[in-house]
Amino acid sequence: MASTNFDLEDQKYLEDVNAVKQWWTDSRWRYTKRPFTAEQIVAKRGTLKIEYPSNTQAKKLWKILEERFNDKTVSYTYGCLEPTMLTQMIKYLDTIYVSGWQSSSTASSTDEPSPDLADYPMNTVPNKVNQLFMAQLFHDRKQREERITTPREKRSSVQNYDYLRPIIADADTGHGGLTAVMKLTKLFVERGAAGIHIEDQAPGTKKCGHMAGKVLVPISEHINRLVAIRAQADIMGTDLLAIARTDSEAATLITSTIDYRDHAYLLGSTNPSLQPLNDLMVAAEQSGKSGEQLQAIEDSWIAQAGIKKFDDAVIDTINQGSFANKKELINRYLTAAKGKSNSEARAIAKGITGMDIYWNWDAPRTRGGFYRYQGGTQCAVNRAVAYAPFADLIWMESKLPDYKQAKEFADGVHAVWPEQKLAYNLSPSFNWKAAMSKEEQLTYIKRLGKLGYCWQFITLAGLHSTALISDQFASAYAKQGMRAYGELIQEPEMERKVDIVTHQKWSGANLIDHSLAMVTGGISSTAAMGKGVTEDQFKS
C-alpha cells in the first residue's frame, strides 16, 4: 500500500471544501436550499478533478433564463429529434429540448418503440443528449475551421451560428429510487446536458403528462429526488439546472399518505356502512366474477361511498347540521385547518362540530394499493411551493393551454416565492385551433412570459414536423417522381439558403479533407471534396 502524507491529504480536502463553500456563495445559488454540507460533497469526490462541458452549458442556460425572467420575456424551443434538426434549430432558438416521449418512440437504447411510459432503459435519453451534444461540438468545430481559414475581408460572408445552445432533457421520474436518480443525473452531466426536468409521478406507473391514470409520490419523496439531482451535480462540480415538474393538476392517485402536505387533497369514503373496496373486489373475484362484472361492482361501490376530500366532508357536515352561523363555522374551520395534517384537521373539525366525522381514506384504495387523490391547480400550487427551494424552475403539467389557469398557478407560486422561474409545456396534445384564435396563438408565449414562464417548449414539435414533411413528400413523390423532390425539397432549400442543400459540406467533408491534408503534408489524392464532387453543381 502506498504511503500517505495525512497532513497533505487533509489539507487538500479542506481546500476543496472551502472551494465548494465559496462556489455556493455565488448569486446562482441565492434561492437554493441544500440539506447537506460541503464536507459531505467533497468526501464523495475522487482525487482526479474532471471539468465537464455540461457545467459551461449550465452556466450559459442560467444566464439566458435569468435575463428572460428579469425582462419578463421567454426562451422557447421544441423537442429535437436528431442532428439535422439541431443544426437548423440553433439558427433561431437559444435552447434545445430533448423529449422522453420522442426518445421512447424513436430512440430507445433497445430499439423497441413504446408510448411515453418511461419503461425504456435509463440511458435512452442521455444517449440522445450525447448524440446531439456531439453534433453540436462537431458543427462548431467545422464552422470555426471554415471561418478561421477564410481571409478576414471575406469572413463576413461565412456563417457564424452559436451551435452550442444549451440542452434541457427529460429525466422522467428518475427511473427508480434515489440512487437511480443520482446515476441518471451523472449520465446527463457526462453527456452534456445543461438542465434536466423530473416529475412527481411514481416510477412504475409513470404516464405521459396527457394520459390518464397518473399516480403521484408524496411531496417529500419528490423533494428527495430534487435533492439527489443537486447533490450529484455538486459532486461533479456542475451548475446543472434542476426543473421540478408536477403532474398533480390532473392526478387521481397517490402512493402514500405519509406527507401531511398531501392530506388536504386525499379522498376518503364518508359511508361507514360499506366494507373497504379492495375487500369487496377480492371476494367478488374469489366467487368467480371477472371483467365487466368486477367493473360494475366497483362502479356501484364508488357511487355509494360518498368519496370526497376531508375538508368537503366537514363542510357538508356543517351545512347539513343545525348549526347557527354555518358560513362563519366553515370559514373558521378552513382557516384553522389550512396546511395541517389530517389528524390535526380532524381535531379542529371536532372542536367546531362536536362530533367525529366519518371519513376513511383507506376504504377506497385501489387494487394496486394506491390512495385516491383530487388534483387541481391549487393542488399543483401547494406542491410547487414545497419544491421551490430545491428547483431552478417549476412546471405544472396541464390539460389545456389555459391562460387563466396558468396565471392562477403563477400567482399562487409567486405569492410565496416571487423569484421562482416557471416553465410551460406548449403541448401538441392540445388542440390549439379549438383552444384559441390565431391572434391569441400569436401572443400566447409572450403573455405567459409576463407571468414568469421564462422557458417554454413544444415537447413533440420535432416529431410532428418530421411526420408532416415526410407525409407530404412521400405522397407527392409517389405521384410526381423527381418533380416532387425538386419542388418540395431542393428548390425551397436553395431559396431559403438552408446549409444542408450542400449536404457533403454540411456533414463536414471540408473539415475532414483539411485534416487529412494536415497529416499528409498537404497532399491527398483521396480528398472527398476534390475534383469531381457533385456539389460543384450548386456553386453560384
UniProtKB/Swiss-Prot annotation:
Pathway: Carbohydrate metabolism; glyoxylate cycle; (S)-malate from isocitrate: step 1/2. One of its GO terms (biological process) is glyoxylate cycle. It holds the Pfam family ICL. The active site is at 208 (proton acceptor). It catalyses: D-threo-isocitrate = glyoxylate + succinate; (2S,3R)-3-hydroxybutane-1,2,3-tricarboxylate = pyruvate + succinate. SUPFAM superfamilies: Phosphoenolpyruvate/pyruvate domain (SSF51621). It is an enzyme of class 4 (lyase). One of its GO terms (cellular component) is glyoxysome. Signal peptide: none annotated. Its cofactor is Mg(2+). Belongs to the isocitrate lyase/PEP mutase superfamily. Isocitrate lyase family. Catalyzes the formation of succinate and glyoxylate from isocitrate, a key step of the glyoxylate cycle, which operates as an anaplerotic route for replenishing the tricarboxylic acid cycle. Required for growth on ethanol or acetate, but dispensable when fermentable carbon sources are available. Also acts on 2-methylisocitrate. NCBIfam families: isocit_lyase. Homotetramer. This is Isocitrate lyase. It comes from Talaromyces marneffei (Penicillium marneffei). The lineage of its organism: Eukaryota, Fungi, Dikarya, Ascomycota, Pezizomycotina.
